[in-house]
């Protein structure tokens, strides 16, 4: 196990550089990539709080050098070997500690319990009938150093969206933009007839910083010309996806915020396939049918007859406090 950019009080200027990539590679030829974190309310059917998310499964039976799986393997090795990645622990004697032995036993017992309860769902799968052949898959990433980054992913996404002929549809859990990002959206809105974004409503957002910033800047976002749909599904939506026309799909870890743009490592897949685009649209629309369109006068267009989540007094107070006490640091959220 290695740690990317371990926190060090002697180098506080590096502490904001985080690894935000989420992917899993199996056998050097198949992988899952998306926006899902690896704790309970992102995985499985655990009780309590949940987050809805999205990943893409890529199967490469005979990966060639230029395939995306090899690009991803190279990316992993680059981060693994870079100077800001260090061993979590590298002392073999730690295995003799009681606490470590206890943790090992808990993992073994937990795995056995999981296997016994779910063995009916664990089997080899032929994905031929469940996947689509693609024309091309491109992996796009931010720089991997821990300092402020050039907005590589944002720039490439912007160029792709500006080239759209008919539509761009974005899903993101948070919107925390600066003027450069707003300007990009204005350019897209001027050239693309159907340009929309879905994000969590203020009441439905699991991130208090995202709620506070969106509540303050909603009209500024609308002034770019983009249509905003607010998700009201009860559980916070964490998916990050983009549809461009009817043949390009984007799935990954990138949020529409300044942290993803300038601070974090990020990975997205750009997939050229009409079948994938259609499948992704169907999945995205399941959530949009539980959303309302925000209008500039503060009212809503509600074609799906959605009951909004109640904005509680506690949430209103939290939004107010974040806006007035921490708004100056919005680029860090």
Feature map (PLM): residue ranges:
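Charged, low-complexity intrinsically disordered terminal segments
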Residues: 1-21, 26-333
């Amino acid at each position: 196990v290695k740690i990317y950019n371990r926190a060090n009080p002697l180098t506080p200027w590096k502490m904001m550089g985080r690894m935000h990539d989420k992917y899993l590679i199996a056998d050097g030829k198949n992988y899952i990539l998306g926006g899902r974190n690896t704790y309970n309310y992102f995985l499985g059917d655990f009780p309590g709080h949940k987050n809805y998310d999205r990943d893409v499964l890529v199967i490469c039976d005979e990966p060639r050098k230029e395939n995306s799986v090899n690009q991803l393997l190279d990316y992993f090795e680059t981060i693994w070997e870079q100077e800001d990645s260090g061993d979590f622990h590298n002392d073999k004697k730690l295995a003799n500690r009681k606490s470590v032995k206890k943790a090992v036993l808990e993992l073994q017992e937990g795995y056995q319990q999981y296997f016994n309860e779910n063995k009916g769902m664990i089997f080899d799968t032929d994905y031929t009938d469940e996947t689509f052949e693609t024309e091309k898959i491109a992996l796009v990433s931010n720089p991997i150093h821990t300092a402020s980054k050039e907005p590589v992913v944002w720039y490439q996404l912007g160029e792709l969206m500006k080239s759209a002929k008919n539509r761009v549809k974005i899903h993101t859990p948070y919107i925390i933009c600066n003027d450069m990002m707003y300007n990009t959206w204005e350019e897209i809105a001027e050239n693309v007839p159907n340009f929309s974004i879905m994000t969590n409503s203020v009441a439905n957002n699991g991130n208090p910083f995202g709620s506070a910033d969106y509540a303050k800047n909603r009209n500024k976002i609308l002034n770019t010309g983009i249509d905003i749909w607010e998700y009201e599904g009860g559980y916070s939506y964490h998916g990050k996806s983009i549809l461009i026309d009817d043949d390009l799909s984007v799935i990954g870890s990138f949020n529409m915020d300044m942290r993803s743009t300038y601070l974090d490592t990020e990975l997205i897949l750009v997939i050229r396939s009409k079948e994938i685009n259609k499948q992704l649209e169907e999945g995205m629309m399941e959530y949009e049918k539980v959303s309302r369109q925000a209008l500039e006068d503060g009212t809503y267009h509600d074609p799906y007859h959605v009951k909004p989540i109640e904005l509680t007094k506690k949430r209103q107070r939290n939004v107010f406090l974040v806006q007035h006490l921490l708004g100056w640091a919005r680029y860090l959220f």
